[in-house]
């Protein structure tokens, strides 16, 4: 547990679910989407090289699976800012005890959840609503 995040492991080593904590009052709320110090304090060791934003118009759309081969593999922080998705990560790390296994999680703005995906995983999602915005 860190200040603005509740980070929990999954059955796949290195893959984590991040629940963001919102601080609010009568004006609205504030939530931190990313903080390298808090992730490192929770044991995250891989740098996040980039953040991408997508908009998917139609419910039922599948994006993925995306994967980068060494030496271009990268860690990802995947967040749904609008709508809802079923997000999946597949362990493709050679020699991993969970090689070939997958984990899925519903991500939405309402549940304030993200997936923290280490290098060596494929990633994709299916939109469960129209007008999904991912970060």
Per-range role (PLM):
Residues 1-113, 129-131:
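Non-catalytic, conserved peripheral segments adjacent to functional cores
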Residues 133-135:
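N-terminal secretory/targeting leader peptides
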